[in-house]
Amino acid sequence: MLLIPAIDLKDGHCVRLEQGDMDKATVFSEDPGAMAAHWISKGARCLHLVDLNGAFAGKLKNESAIKSILKAVGDEIPVQLGGGIRDLETIERLLDDGISTVIIGTAAVKNPGFVQDACTAFPGHVMVGLDARDGKVATDGWSKITCHKVIDLAKKFEDWGVEAIIYTDIGRDGMLKGVNIDATVKLAQAIRIPVIASGGLSNNQDIDALCKAEEEGVMGVIAGRSIYASDLDLAAAQKYADELTLKYKKKTN
């Protein structure tokens, strides 16, 4: 079970939102590169970046901050990025700059064929982000709720080579209320693509439940406010997850 620190970028700063509300942003650092280095020092094995301004604008808006993070990271760990990725040219540029995996969100909902094109052009470098409120997918920085159900939409991407589905429960994001385990597991059971949980991670009980769900296809979880507010220590939490993974694997063997 991989715990992936999130670095959400707004106006060049590292922030955390509450339920995706841009007016409820807490600034945790004005130096995203330093924040990336901090998480690496804590044992992060991957970083999850979101260009929040880009998600609303439909194009990248925090490229300077993204480049500062990539400079700080170097070749140490992979970096995934979502928010405002709507064309193949942007994907190519990001991969050339050092991003390991791009996350297609709004564009995947509005034009699923774009995901297939991206997977064909950049195999092994594409994930899909599905963000939902009450089971319905949201787009445009979570500002619009669609009629699409998460599982129905996710099934469209099964045969195209998508590396993972990042599933976010908007209602829990930034609220420290616990991961929506039931919805995450149901999604993982319904599709053949690995699932990364997002939204609400708060304590070791969440980690325990997620580790139990690994055999269902849940491969990781995005860690946000819990590690910024020190409710969870990243290094200790990852160690705990590693121990649980071994424990549950032994039980199933």
Curated annotation (Swiss-Prot):
UniProt-listed SUPFAM superfamilies: Ribulose-phoshate binding barrel
CDD domains: HisA (cd04732)
Record-level GO BP terms: L-histidine biosynthetic process; L-tryptophan biosynthetic process
Reactions that this protein is recorded to catalyse: 1-(5-phospho-beta-D-ribosyl)-5-[(5-phospho-beta-D-ribosylamino)methylideneamino]imidazole-4-carboxamide = 5-[(5-phospho-1-deoxy-D-ribulos-1-ylimino)methylamino]-1-(5-phospho-beta-D-ribosyl)imidazole-4-carboxamide
Annotated active site: 8 (proton acceptor), 131 (proton donor)
Entry keyword set: Amino-acid biosynthesis, Cytoplasm, Histidine biosynthesis, Isomerase
A Pfam entry, by short name: His_biosynth
EC numbers for this chain: 5.3.1.16
Record flagged with keyword Amino-acid biosynthesis: yes
InterPro entries: Aldolase_TIM, His_biosynth, HisA_bact_arch, Isoase_HisA-like, Isoase_HisA-like_bact, RibuloseP-bd_barrel
Compartments where found: Cytoplasm
GO MF annotations in UniProt: 1-(5-phosphoribosyl)-5-[(5-phosphoribosylamino)methylideneamino]imidazole-4-carboxamide isomerase activity
Annotated metabolic or biological route of this protein: Amino-acid biosynthesis; L-histidine biosynthesis; L-histidine from 5-phospho-alpha-D-ribose 1-diphosphate: step 4/9
Keyword Glycoprotein assigned: no
GO cellular component entries: cytoplasm
PANTHER family per record: 1-(5-PHOSPHORIBOSYL)-5-[(5-PHOSPHORIBOSYLAMINO)METHYLIDENEAMINO] IMIDAZOLE-4-CARBOXAMIDE ISOMERASE (PTHR43090:SF2)
Sequence similarity: Belongs to the HisA/HisF family.
Name recorded for this polypeptide: 1-(5-phosphoribosyl)-5-[(5-phosphoribosylamino)methylideneamino] imidazole-4-carboxamide isomerase
Record organism: Polynucleobacter necessarius subsp. necessarius (strain STIR1)
